């Protein structure tokens, strides 16, 4: 039998001791049961280091671009998606909201972007590619991504990213601000990938 242990919503400096404790527990259980055991670390992901200096640049460019405009056909498609997924039929929401505050406890989810953010300053942008309330990781999102609603969102995000990169290329002061915040948030932490070197143990998953 296998024992699976997931650790989420923990900063990396706290996660290693917990992982080591879990390994010790597995070893103790194996000794008590007089059986062999094997530990396979299948995945391990760092939390994402935010960069508000970079986020402010991206936010400014989103506001320059303005909200995405949708056709009547796209809005009707969005409402149909909401109907079949039992969501309020509110259509699309293209409002550009203010840059959100950095939350101490941002909630669940994980991404290897977190690992990247410990090696280089990272700027994220979120743009609508599906109707309000659409369940993520579902066929409904895929359906929207395969038609103009998703295409418009992807192009809008691409424009905001390109404009942000252009700002950084042309303004050394902006680069300095982003880099300084990255170094301050990272502190003295040294990035070490949690997953061991070599091919991933996919057969153990």
Identify the residue ranges that each predicted region occupies.
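Single conserved hydrophobic/aromatic residue that forms the stacking wall/gate
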Residues: 1-12
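Divalent metal-coordination and catalytic microenvironments
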Residues: 58, 116, 161
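Generic structural signal for well-ordered, non-membrane alpha-helical segments
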Residues: 12-15, 19, 47, 51, ...
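Zn-dependent metallopeptidase/amidohydrolase metal-coordination segment
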Residues: 75-158, 176-205
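Short glycine/serine- and small hydrophobic-enriched flexible loop segments
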Residues: 162-170
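Acidic-enriched catalytic cores of C-N bond-cleaving enzymes acting on peptides and small amides
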Residues: 13-40, 47-91
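Generic beta-strand/beta-sheet core signal
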Residues: 9, 40-42, 126-128
